[in-house]
Amino acid sequence: MGRRIAVVLFNLGGPDTGNDVQPFLKNLFRDPAIIRAPLPVRWLVARLISTLRAPVVKQNYAMMDAGGGSPLLRETKKQADALQAELAKKLPGDEVRCFIAMRYWHPFTEEAAAEVQKWGADEVVLLPLYPQFSTTTTGSSLSAWHKAYKGKSRTICCYPFEENFVSAHVDQIMAAWERAGRPGNVNLLLSAHGLPESVVKSGDPYQWQCEALAEMIAGRVPADWEVSVCYQSRVGPMKWIGPPTEEEIARISDQGRNILIAPIAFVSEHIETLVELGEEYRLVAEKHGAASYTRVEALGVHPGFISTLTGEVLAALGMKETIRSCAGGRLCPSGWSGCPQAELKQKAGVRITETAG
């Protein structure tokens, strides 16, 4: 009899209906990985932000769904089904089941952990649908998981440079360019969710991974395109990493150029791709005179992306180590102390001196 292998997909989560928007936002902003303040302050800030932002955010969700909910769970289920089917082919002697663990809405991490425990998994692989590691996303999900599930598990921390993943991005970008009529004078904007500068300065490797991925993509698109990285979805008065996506769109549009904009940190369609990139920033481009504005679709169930996830799970199952990146061992240069492999070695009393690769 083969193994029971549970693959747990981490993602952000999203409200099911308009009535869920405010409690979803409250869950998000009271996470200590997001608002780095003492508990009483964090709860007050979460209540304030969720109350102030809920009306506008509700309108944005209503643009995507008549019930005012997020498509993220639906899209994640499609990815889970595709991954489970591929793993079943690769592991015919084992029983593989994919579970979804959302951080800020149902099915919560705690619910997924209870399901995995009830199923009686022999192996558990934690697979974030965040390609780049950040303490604010994967790090937060891992913390919640280890509080909820006391059994052993293997972690895939990041896979931003995996070959099929990079190729899938390029494929989506070129397909969007074809749909746009193959325009010239192209600026390709590779947009990722922003982070406060203080998070990056504390050792979070997210920005480094995003920008290294962007360099890989830039080397595979037409040489006459101008390619740049930008960061969206800023919240609050803190200083964030940049340049901001909205400002880059305005700057390039003022030159009358054709804009292709691709999400490189979001792998599923949701409010930040469909509304922010698809609608709000389109208006900015039109206002500033862009020749055209084309949004590249998120990877979704692109075969290259599902192949990436499949390969990472298989590799994790074959390793003695409990944490894996797409490089096998540690991916990040030694300066990024927020890397989970660095933290693991620090806990074991190992001095960190190695570099990327």
From Swiss-Prot:
Enzyme Commission designation: 4.98.1.1
Domain of life of the source: Bacteria
Residues annotated as signal peptide: none
Alphabetical list of Pfam families matching this protein: Ferrochelatase
GO terms (BP aspect): heme biosynthetic process
Catalytic activity: heme b + 2 H(+) = protoporphyrin IX + Fe(2+)
Chain positions recorded as Fe cation binding sites: H193, E272
UniProt cross-references to Gene3D superfamilies, sorted A to Z: 3.40.50.1400
Gene Ontology cellular component list: cytoplasm
Keyword Glycoprotein assigned: no
Keywords tagged on the record: Cytoplasm, Heme biosynthesis, Iron, Lyase, Metal-binding, Porphyrin biosynthesis
Pathway: Porphyrin-containing compound metabolism; protoheme biosynthesis; protoheme from protoporphyrin-IX: step 1/1
Top EC class of this enzyme: lyase
GO MF annotation terms: ferrochelatase activity; metal ion binding
SUPFAM superfamilies referenced in this protein's UniProt entry, alphabetically: Chelatase
Localization terms from the record: Cytoplasm
Role according to the record: Catalyzes the ferrous insertion into protoporphyrin IX.
Family designation: Belongs to the ferrochelatase family.
Protein name, per record: Ferrochelatase
Organism whose genome encodes this protein: Hyphomonas neptunium (strain ATCC 15444)
